[in-house]
């Protein structure tokens, strides 16, 4: 299975991990300096869930993001599935 959420379209993003050195100015230091920059990936918070579909009268096993789960709690599974189909996720 891919790491893309079928309901929200969230997918892994690219970014950097910074290595810092020094003492923060908040702690009365001279400030933090960047000593290294490494490429990394930021992954969405994916969960495998079994959700009940009232239209199909059965459980659906979906690998969705945590934000999609909040949308389902708010709007209902059928409405979220309709939106995902219309947006072609």
Curated annotation (Swiss-Prot):
UniProt-listed SUPFAM superfamilies: L28p-like
Which GO terms of the molecular function aspect are on file?
A: structural constituent of ribosome
Q: Name one GO cellular component term.
A: ribonucleoprotein complex
Q: Which Gene3D superfamilies match?
A: Ribosomal protein L28/L24
Q: Which UniProt keywords apply?
A: Ribonucleoprotein, Ribosomal protein
Which is a GO BP term held by this UniProt record? translation
| Family, similarity comment | Belongs to the bacterial ribosomal protein bL28 family.
This protein's name = Large ribosomal subunit protein bL28
Q: Which organism is it from?
A: Chlamydia pneumoniae
This chain is encoded by the gene named: rpmB
């Amino acid at each position: 299975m891919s790491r893309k959420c079928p309901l929200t379209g969230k997918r892994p993003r690219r970014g950097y991990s910074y290595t810092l050195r020094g003492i923060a100015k908040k702690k009365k230091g001279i400030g933090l300096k960047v000593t290294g920059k490494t490429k990394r990936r930021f992954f969405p918070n994916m969960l495998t869930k079994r959700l009940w579909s009232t239209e199909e009268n059965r459980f659906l096993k979906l690998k969705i993001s945590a934000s999609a789960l909040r949308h389902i709690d708010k709007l209902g599974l059928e409405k979220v599935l309709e939106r995902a189909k219309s947006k072609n996720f």
